[in-house]
């Protein structure tokens, strides 16, 4: 077992309610990406995601695409080659 796992699980337990609250805030934004009528809501969701990432210490920005905007966030100014990274593709 990873030696960091117990600390990670404890932190998740401690922040469960706050994490769920953030999730529900995002889910309340009507960001239906398949319906053009909700394009503004998709932008709102992207801005919300970027702002929330910044609140918890990430460098985050909203970037334009040919479709809906995408959110890019980094937890450090530079990434050393070979370090692990995460791609999260989720709601909005």
How would you name each of these model-derived features?
Residues 2-92:
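Acidic/His- and Gly-rich active-site-bordering loop/insert found
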């Amino acid at each position: 077992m990873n030696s960091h796992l117990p600390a990670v699980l404890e932190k998740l337990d401690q922040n469960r309610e706050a994490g769920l609250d953030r999730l529900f805030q995002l889910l309340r934004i009507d960001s239906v990406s398949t319906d053009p009528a909700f394009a503004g809501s998709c932008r709102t969701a992207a801005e919300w995601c970027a702002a929330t990432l910044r609140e918890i210490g990430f460098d985050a920005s909203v970037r334009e695409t040919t479709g809906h905007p995408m959110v890019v966030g980094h937890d450090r100014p530079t990434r050393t080659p070979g370090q692990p990274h995460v791609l999260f593709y989720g709601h909005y």
